[in-house]
């Protein structure tokens, strides 16, 4: 009998213990990351061949305390390696763990390697070679604080590598994880199993191999014991032959196919079919291209299990689509799979609540670095389902957080706002406006409509707010927005807005290059909803731009810190004599040019200038009748000579603007600094007068956010 250790993913240790016991292991003892057990040769080989949950099977050779690299080397060089393999074989050392002296795993692996080759030299043998790709012998060393365990890896390559997967779709499950998911589900052999989002088919293939009694490693060609001197070839051949005969018997029984795999992507289905063929279970699984929204029960009056690992996104941009996917999936489960069991594995537990199903059991697990959960459900019988569907029409929403009343309040507020603001916007001939702006403190976000698109901007939560609760609230909000607006998920865009530093408001978020135009008081303006934090149009300045258009008739107009030139468009459409548009960003200046062309505004009288606005202003010798200046609150761009602070520097700016302002000219000055205070005394010294018009420039959709900007009319004193 040998002392052995089976490694597995965290969370599966107890499940592995049951499997090992069923395979004949004795004295099983669970520890974190695996199970210790004893076994004779026959059981050892049977476990290697049949274990669906083990990552590796290790034979411990050395267990000792080490306090230095010399202790490590001495422990290795003192081991009788010739009893395990000779000098002609290649080997590789896997080293995991550190302590105060062995601080790097590469150093630990090197010292183990040195000890092994030096042992052979001391015994008059040649040094065995290291092979990092295909070693004959694999040595596994694990250091936990000061305790070292050195083992012979009998598996060779990790046991999750079954050999049947030639190609996969995105984010494939490891075979060992897939097997654990199947074993933890409520599926019973001989009953139907359906995977509606099967990807490369790993869940179904693992289950089908269980049904067909196919050993997961039946077709493995290379093992970690092939060149081990302790290998018992006779016993191994016996165990392997038993596995071959079991698989043949199952095949000859002509099992009825009752595994179904669906996926929207026909390309990944082809990979799944090939994988199933390699695994010897292609005759048991039926594959079909299909969307979850059209999912139908493929069986006839049979009761079975739905098993699935739906997509889950770490990036927030995928959230609207995922909420819709899980909601639709839950609906189809209730209408098509009454009295069935369902087992869902997900890395986003909050999304599972969108199924609107009550789990009777759940398990925690890891998928690589991700914390995941598997939940088991039972679908109510059909009469209960029909009643539930009748009572859950359009106004009933799927919410994630526990406080569903607050979530319903958000939905009601949004519905009320839409009724009021949509009517107003239609009268004003607008199709870009705000629907919601942190009206409820629990839902600190903005919702903007851009034609047939919706942008949700979540303001960054304070550090004292629990991240999970904030995430749940966001899921609730998106779910409500999808339901209340009826918008398609691919037209809902989600962004997280944080406090800006320097020029970070100009940083790119994506590179989709998707532009379309919106209408604003007769102007057409290009917007881009995905590539930048801002869209190219500041909605709160809509009335300011309208006012500039009305003031611009026959005047020379200057737009400083122009952004995408939307104010210039209004001035030009208002029959300005000339326009000059200045911005430091070449990207936004090109955008401004496209805005002008979109409105058929052309000619030498419309100038676009790429420059540092403050430096350009210092050198400008032209005179203007109407100047619009909307500077950033703060900027320390490397392309600017000095930093800029609107509170600190606005009087200096006004002094320069006065110089180029004609006698009867007007400056429209605006900024977004909350608490901004105009230096009236400083203006008087410059012989300028100022009148605040902030309230007049605040449109209906921003009337609750009175501090979003401040706006001033500044003229020469008469």
UniProtKB/Swiss-Prot annotation:
Its EC number is 2.1.1.173, 2.1.1.264. Residues 43-154 form the THUMP domain. InterPro entries: 23SrRNA_methyltr_KL, DNA_methylase_N6_adenine_CS, RlmKL-like_Mtase, RlmKL-like_Mtase_CS, RlmL_1st, SAM-dep_methyl-trfase, SAM-dependent_MTases_sf, THUMP_dom. GO terms for cellular component: cytoplasm. It comes from the Bacteria. HAMAP family: 23SrRNA_methyltr_KL. Belongs to the methyltransferase superfamily. RlmKL family. This is Ribosomal RNA large subunit methyltransferase K/L.
């Amino acid at each position: 009998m040998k002392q052995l250790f089976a490694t597995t993913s965290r969370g599966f240790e107890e499940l592995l213990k049951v499997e090992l016991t069923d395979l004949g292991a004795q004295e099983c003892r669970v520890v974190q990351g695996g199970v210790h057990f004893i076994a004779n040769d026959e059981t050892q080989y049977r476990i290697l061949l049949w274990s669906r949950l083990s990552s590796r099977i290790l034979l411990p050779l050395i267990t000792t305390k080490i306090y230095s690299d010399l202790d490590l080397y001495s422990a290795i060089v003192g081991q009788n390696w010739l009893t395990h393999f000779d000098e002609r074989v290649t080997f590789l050392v896997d080293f995991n763990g550190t302590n105060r002296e062995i601080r790097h795993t590469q150093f630990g692996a090197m010292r183990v390697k040195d000890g092994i080759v030096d042992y052979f030299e001391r015994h008059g043998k040649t040094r065995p070679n290291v092979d990092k790709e295909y070693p004959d012998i694999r040595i596994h060393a694990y250091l936990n604080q000061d305790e070292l365990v050195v083992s012979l890896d009998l598996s060779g390559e990790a046991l999750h590598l079954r050999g049947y997967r030639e190609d996969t779709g995105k984010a494939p499950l490891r075979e060992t994880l897939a097997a654990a998911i199947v074993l933890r589900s409520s599926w019973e052999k001989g009953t139907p199993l359906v995977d509606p989002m099967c990807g490369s088919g790993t869940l179904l293939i693992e289950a089908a191999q269980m049904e067909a009694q196919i050993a997961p490693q039946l077709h493995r060609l290379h093992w970690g014991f092939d060149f081990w001197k302790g290998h018992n070839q006779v016993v191994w051949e016996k165990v392997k032959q038993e596995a071959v005969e079991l698989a043949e018997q199952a095949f000859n029984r002509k099992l009825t196919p009752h595994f179904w795999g669906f996926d929207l992507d026909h390309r990944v289905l082809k990979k799944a079919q090939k994988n199933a063929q390699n695994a010897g279970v292609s005759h048991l699984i039926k594959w079909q291209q299909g969307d979850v929204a059209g999912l139908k029960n493929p069986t006839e009056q049979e009761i079975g299990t739905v098993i699935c690992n739906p997509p889950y996104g770490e990036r927030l941009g995928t959230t609207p689509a995922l909420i819709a996917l899980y909601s639709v999936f839950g609906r189809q489960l209730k209408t098509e799979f009454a009295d069935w069991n369902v087992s869902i594995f997900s890395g986003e537990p909050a999304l599972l609540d969108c199924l609107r199903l009550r789990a009777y059991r759940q398990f925690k697990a890891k998928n690589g670095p991700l914390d995941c959960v598997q939940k088991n459900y039972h679908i109510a019988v059909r009469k209960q389902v029909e009643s539930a569907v009748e009572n859950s029409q359009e106004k009933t929403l799927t919410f994630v957080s526990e406080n569903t009343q607050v979530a319903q309040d958000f939905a009601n507020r949004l519905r009320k706002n839409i009724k009021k603001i949509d009517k107003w916007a239609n009268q004003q001939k607008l199709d870009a406006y705000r629907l919601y702006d942190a009206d409820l403190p629990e839902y600190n976000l903005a919702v903007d409509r851009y034609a047939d698109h919706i942008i949700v901007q979540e303001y960054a939560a304070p550090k004292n707010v629990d991240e999970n609760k904030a995430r749940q609230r966001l899921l609730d909000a998106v779910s409500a927005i999808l339901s209340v607006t009826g918008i398609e998920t691919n037209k809902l865009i989600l962004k997280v807005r944080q406090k800006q530093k320097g020029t970070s408001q100009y940083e790119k978020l994506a590179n989709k290059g998707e532009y379309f135009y919106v209408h604003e008081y007769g102007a057409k303006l290009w917007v881009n909803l995905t590539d930048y934090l801002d869209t190219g149009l500041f909605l709160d300045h809509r009335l300011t731009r309208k006012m500039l258009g009305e003031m611009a008739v026959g005047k020379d107009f200057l737009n400083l810190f122009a952004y995408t030139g939307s104010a210039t468009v209004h001035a030009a459409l208002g029959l300005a004599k000339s326009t000059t548009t200045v911005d430091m960003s070449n990207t936004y200046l090109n955008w401004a040019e496209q805005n002008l062309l979109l409105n058929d505004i052309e000619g030498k009288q419309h100038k676009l200038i790429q420059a540092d606005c403050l430096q350009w202003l210092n050198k400008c010798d032209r005179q203007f009748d109407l100047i619009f200046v909307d500077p950033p609150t703060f900027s320390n761009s490397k392309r600017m000579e000095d930093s800029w602070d609107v509170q600190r520097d606005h009087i200096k700016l006004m002094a320069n603007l006065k110089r180029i302002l004609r006698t009867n000219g007007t400056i429209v000055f605006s900024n977004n600094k909350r608490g901004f205070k105009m230096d009236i005394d400083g203006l008087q010294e410059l012989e300028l007068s100022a009148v605040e018009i902030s309230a007049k420039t605040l449109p209906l959709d921003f009337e609750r956010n009175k501090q979003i900007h401040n706006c001033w009319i500044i003229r020469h004193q008469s």
